[in-house]
Amino acid sequence: MIYKAVFVCLVLVLLGDVFCSPRNSGGGTLNDNPFEKRTDCRFVGAKCTKANNPCVGKVCNGYQLYCPVDDDHCIMKLTFIPG
């Protein structure tokens, strides 16, 4: 009987951790971690110029996007940003 009570308490604690823990809420804002993994992958290959650079601040699967030269296309940097 005591094992059953311990098991029930353990299950409730684990469920509470899963459902109430802020780290598992799926939330997190970009202010928490500026290099958080985002999926701005739609900008990969986008046309970029000096005047119009859609790559700035975009991250695709942990890789920061940038415009290698003026009048080119957005590509991913090879350095991985953990997030």
Curated annotation (Swiss-Prot):
Contains 3 disulfide bonds. Residues 21-36 form a propeptide. It comes from Actinia equina. The keyword Secreted applies. Expressed by acrorhagi. Toxin. Residues 1-20 form the signal peptide. GO terms for cellular component: extracellular region; nematocyst. The keyword Phosphoprotein does not apply. The modification Proline amide is found at residue 82. GO terms for molecular function: toxin activity. It is found in: Secreted; Nematocyst. This is U-actitoxin-Aeq6b. Keywords: Amidation, Cleavage on pair of basic residues, Disulfide bond, Nematocyst, Secreted, Signal, Toxin.
